[in-house]
Amino acid sequence: MAVSSLVVGISDCKVTRDANSVLVTYALGSCIAVAMHDPVSKVSGLLHYMLPESAIDSKKAAQNPFMFADTGIPSMLDALKAAGGDGKRMIVRLAGGAQVLDSQGVFQIGKRNYLAARRILWKAGMLIAGEAVGGDVSRTTRLEVSTGRQWVREAGGVERELVRNSAGAKRTEQA
């Protein structure tokens, strides 16, 4: 069977259990991609959010919860559970959070996005198994639904797999 790519746009989330699918999102600058995979049910999801907190625009958050970390991550978890996933089994990885448009570091959207994800996941009792965050380059990431393997490619770089070690999280880069 042919593998199909499910493209996750900005302020978007896709959840699937189709083993022939790969979830992919492009051009992660300061945005964050949250990838989750349940190795038992094979339910996977990929969220691409723009901003850390919905309080800045509750109307937009109501229209599209995937725009913000604080509304997008819980909405993603609800969708994963509805598809048969178990939050306690989820392998979670992050990519993005770069400082690409704010060279002076005034707004630090990438860092704030990353910290929001960590806080929300921690409150949900979920550990981050791998991440490629920070820096000043954009990234593309893809999640293979059948295996839960995830790859990241930085602009101008080679694709590499985000791996999970036995102790839990393995950092590939830091914010």
Regions found by a protein language model. Give the residues of each.
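Short acidic-hydrophobic catalytic motif
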Residues: M1-C31, D38-A61, P65-I91, A98-A175
